[in-house]
């Protein structure tokens, strides 16, 4: 089997309004545009549950209308463990109901006004480990894989954070989503991280990084240095090669938090790059 190419469509929804009908219209537009560009698989944030919770079949039918598969929903955990687990289980249930297979998740941030990058805080990471272990086990009963995403500005970001989290989570239930841009911001070679985590990788996020802009950025501005594929310095052919070495045949999901022109234009640039540089 070959790797599958996906795109995140939450960026359509944050510009289209959060009232239910506007959100649904934006989601449908993302399906239509991404299918036109050649993306057969789609990811979104778990907040879309708010608009379809009473009728998941409506979202199943929308996927069929455009012949796309919404394979992943993305959740965020703060440090209230019981609340995070309760919310996570509801999101996993909804994901399973619409046919999704992967549940991406991350810490939602430190919850204070302190710096965005900090030494490993074992107390904070332990909370993420406990939440992930419980939800990962639950997800398996629903046919879903939990994939934790190390992310800038959170308690699981650096190499030390990742090592601690990996050592304290169940490898049979808790997997990883490696993000090529966030690892680059952490000073981690994404190729090396792929090889390190190996079979624990169940999902991939592809983003490029403009390191010149990064050198001029501080704090949260660093995430404004992400680019469409091919417009930065990430060696995606090497990333693909490392994934092939570990036998990965899952999803390569392109994400761009802040498109320069529009979601469609950025998605088109990345899709052309994937075809030309990666042969997918």
Across the structure, where does each feature detected by a protein language model lie?
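Residues at the N-termini of beta-strands
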Residues: 41, 102, 203, 250-251
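Aromatic/hydrophobic pocket-lining residues that form the small-molecule binding cavity
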Residues: 27, 56, 84-91, 125-132, ...
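Flexible glycine/acidic-rich beta-alpha junction loops that bind and position SAM and/or redox cofactors
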Residues: 15-18, 107-115, 185, 209-221, ...
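Acidic-and-aromatic substrate-binding clefts and catalytic sites of carbohydrate-active enzymes
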Residues: 14, 21-23, 44-56, 77-86, ...
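Active-site groove signature of glycoside hydrolases
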Residues: 99-118, 142-151, 253-254
